[in-house]
A protein has these predicted regions:
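Accessory, non-ATPase domains that flank or precede helicase/AAA+ motor cores in DNA-metabolism machines
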Residues: 1-393, 405-419
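Inter-lobe coupling/hinge segments of SF2-like helicase ATPases
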Residues: 233-242, 254-602
Length: 602
């Protein structure tokens, strides 16, 4: 048999002809020799005709079955055709990175008469011979079953420290650094070591390690559980939400655009539709544009669907984690899969509904080969599978809004908030303010909000302490030697950092241009705003959320947990605090230096 093969990880736009003796299906993975090396290939199609040329044979089959359905194959062809994407790169999307979990073949008897338990195929052949196995298979007394060698991903572990005893500490002789650590731990039960280093701004872990070795501190290793955070579900839909749900369930259309302003309850409508399909044994694919949106969403889904298997899938996970979730999704063990655009390609066994939240977001566009639009691919996948797809946004894409007028997509609208009213927006003129960063009125509102037990979000569009360092004498701005852009001053690290390439350098003592000592840090970022607010409100707990303090999804989820538990009153952050977060005690949002945002591209 001749087959057309797409070469894995190849930028080439062609498929290649190989021959194989074993039965094979489109979508299966095989090993082939291509350009002098053995590599993975994907069976794209089967052929009967043989050309007048020598054809290579396939080395071996990799999986013994195709993981891809007809819908997956048609979706791959759509992406190849629509975005001129290389076939091998497109098929790579459907599989997790790295070598897929190994598959063991087992010989399983149909009855107990043969008197042996399920046995690995290789061991069976070694003990009884291959001819005997063929005889049993031909007489249908045994069958071959596949079992995946599942690696158990390591659970995250954190190390927390606490005082061995809180009495008698004062009498001990402590160095200044040790005293800082002890004073802090006198006010709390325990603290994670990495967090303790950050909060106390320690240059190294040495003071903590020394206190542990002296027996003053106790250390405890705790295994973390990803599923602790649960947000209780909303009991009942509002009248307008029920109307939208009814339209979805009664419509002949399969594609919907749910246009609803922030806070109108689009998520509750999603959950109601999800409930319908889950009760019918179907799987749900829930797409979000960024990893940062998954922690709180997962907590809400767990609260709405207790007992359901809810997983997340994104590029920040380890290879083993992604492979395990991929495999469980393929086998139909996952009820709800939440993830970024990469989760669109997981070949789920029984998908019944696709939800694309924040469908307008540019993060759904793949910016590297193979290029594609994740939202358009999701719509096409739903059409191929004849299942509903719901696109949700407060600011829908223009082209999708146009499709609602032509009838290809049904438009649904939510205009009323189920709880509360839309916020009052005040614009404060900073011309006459003494403080160039935060107005007197804003400070008074923060004080009032915090005193009432509520929380405040402060959005700053740049991280760091100061945007640039300039020489007053000659006007020279300190720039990155690699990028020629101004370097940002970070006060906590006492360094200049380039936010483009990551280059770091110490602050020069004199101007590199004229030799003057009149260097000054100008502008501000999250670090400066946090510093100023802490001066105004010394007893208020302030958290900063930017790429300096939150550098991975685990840290982000921990920060959200701190906010939900009200362990901080004021949260200062960059755009990571502006997307999809919903905390009932946040009563005030402050946008610092809003003028600068007006000239930014959207």
């Amino acid at each position: 048999m001749l087959i057309q093969i797409a070469i894995s990880n190849s930028p080439l736009h062609d498929t290649y002809t190989y021959k194989i003796d074993a039965p094979v299906e489109p979508g299966e993975r095989v090993e082939v020799n291509f350009a002098g090396r053995n590599t993975i290939g994907y069976v794209v199609s089967l052929e009967e005709k043989r050309g007048p040329f020598k054809i290579k044979s396939v080395n071996k089959k990799v999986d013994d079955r195709s993981f891809l359905s007809q819908v997956d194959l048609e979706l791959a062809k759509f992406v190849m055709r629509e975005y001129l994407a290389p076939p091998g790169k497109v098929f790579d999307l459907f599989f997790p990175p790295g070598k897929l979990l190994s598959i063991d073949d087992y010989v399983v008897a149909f009855s107990d008469e043969l008197g042996f338990p399920p046995t690995q195929k290789d061991k069976f052949i070694k003990e009884f011979g291959e001819d005997y196995l063929k005889k049993l298979l031909a007489s249908r007394k045994v069958k071959i079953m596949h079992s995946f060698d599942r690696k158990t991903p390591k659970k995250r572990k954190t190390r927390r420290v606490s005082l061995a005893k809180k009495t008698g500490i004062i009498e001990q002789e402590l160095t200044p650094l040790w005293q800082i650590v002890v004073d802090y731990l006198l006010s709390v039960e325990s603290e994670e070591i990495t967090e303790l280093e950050k909060k106390l701004k320690l240059r190294s872990r040495s003071p903590i390690d020394t206190l542990i070795s002296k027996g003053i501190l106790l250390v405890e290793e705790i295994e973390e559980d990803d599923s602790h955070w649960v947000i209780p579900a909303v009991d009942e839909l509002s009248v307008s939400q029920k109307e939208v749900y009814r339209e979805i369930m009664e419509s002949d259309s399969k594609s919907f655009l749910l246009h609803g302003l922030t806070g109108t309850g689009k998520t509750e409508v999603y959950f109601k539709v999800m409930e319908y399909w889950l009760n019918r044994g179907r799987q749900i694919l829930y797409l979000v544009p960024e990893v940062s949106l998954t922690p709180q969403l997962l907590a809400r889904i767990r609260g709405a669907f207790p007992g359901r298997d809810v997983r997340q899938y994104h590029s920040y996970m380890t290879r083993v984690q992604r492979q395990m979730i991929w495999l469980d999704s393929v086998e139909g063990n996952v009820d709800i899969l939440v993830g970024t655009r990469s989760s669109l390609w997981v070949p789920m066994k029984n998908t019944g509904l696709i939800i694309v939240d924040e469908e307008h977001d540019s993060s759904f566009y793949q910016q590297s080969v193979p290029f594609y639009d994740g939202v358009q691919a999701a719509i096409r996948k739903a059409e191929l599978g004849n299942i509903p797809v719901i696109l949700g946004s407060a600011t829908p894409r223009v082209d999708h809004y146009h499709l609602t007028e032509s009838g290809r997509i049904s438009l649904l609208s939510l205009t009323e908030r189920p709880v509360g009213s839309f916020p009052t927006i005040r614009v404060i003129d900073m011309k006459d303010e003494k403080n160039p960063i935060i107005s007197k009125q804003a400070l008074e509102e923060i004080k009032r909000t915090v005193s009432e037990g509520k929380q405040v979000f402060v959005f700053v569009h740049r991280k760091g302490y100061s945007n640039y360092v300039v020489c007053y004498t000659c006007g020279k701005t300190i720039t990155c030697p690699h990028c020629s852009v101004s370097m940002t001053f970070h006060r906590n690290d006492n360094l200049l950092k380039c936010h483009y390439c990551g280059h770091r350098s110490a602050i020069p003592k004199v101007c590199p241009e004229c030799g003057s000592m009149t260097l000054s840090a100008r502008g501000f970022g999250t670090e400066r705003v946090e510093h100023d607010l802490q001066k105004f409100f010394p007893s208020t707990k302030i958290m900063r959320m930017d790429r300096e303090t939150i550098d991975n999804p685990i840290a982000y989820e921990k920060a959200l947990l701190e906010i939900s538990r009200k362990n901080c009153q004021v949260i200062v952050g960059t755009k990571m605090i502006t997307k999809g977060l919903d905390f009932p005690d946040v009563e005030m949002v402050l946008i610092v230096d809003a003028d600068r945002l007006m000239s930014f591209p959207s």
